[in-house]
Amino acid sequence: NEKLTDAETKEYEKVKQRVYQISKEAHTANQPLFIDAEESWIQPAIDALADENMALFNKEKAIVYNTFQLYRKDRLDFLKQTIAKGKANGFHVGAKLVRGAYMEKERARAIEKNYPSPIQDTKENSDRDYNLALEECVKNIDMMGLCAGTHNEKSSLYLADLLTKYA
């Protein structure tokens, strides 16, 4: 949440332009573009880039996808907000759902910087939010593209059941 320096702002503008160009090429080629998730302290900038390009290039279908790490406590709500934003602004949401990959690093940084860990307290909570995210996406499948990034058998079977029920 620190203010960027002038040099950092200039660099971020270059990143925005590069992501725009890549998104534009993906749209022209009719190929999906998956923007990967990172650590919580840099994720807001990535989310902003993904949202901006989804709004521009996902008018007819999902081309640009953001990655939602459901091992974070706040990401189910963020997914719901993104879906609402897509509905309100007339764009399809591209959602790649994953559990997450930075658990130890996130917890260590939270201790070091003295803030609450953004990571779910238990694996069961991660599983719960992952499955709730699947349900949210399938219920809104008419305005979504979904990539379910999981090896979890229960979640895969749950997704199959949801698709039978809603899609």
Predicted regions and their residues:
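Positively charged, amphipathic and often flexible ligand-engagement surfaces
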Residues: 1-167
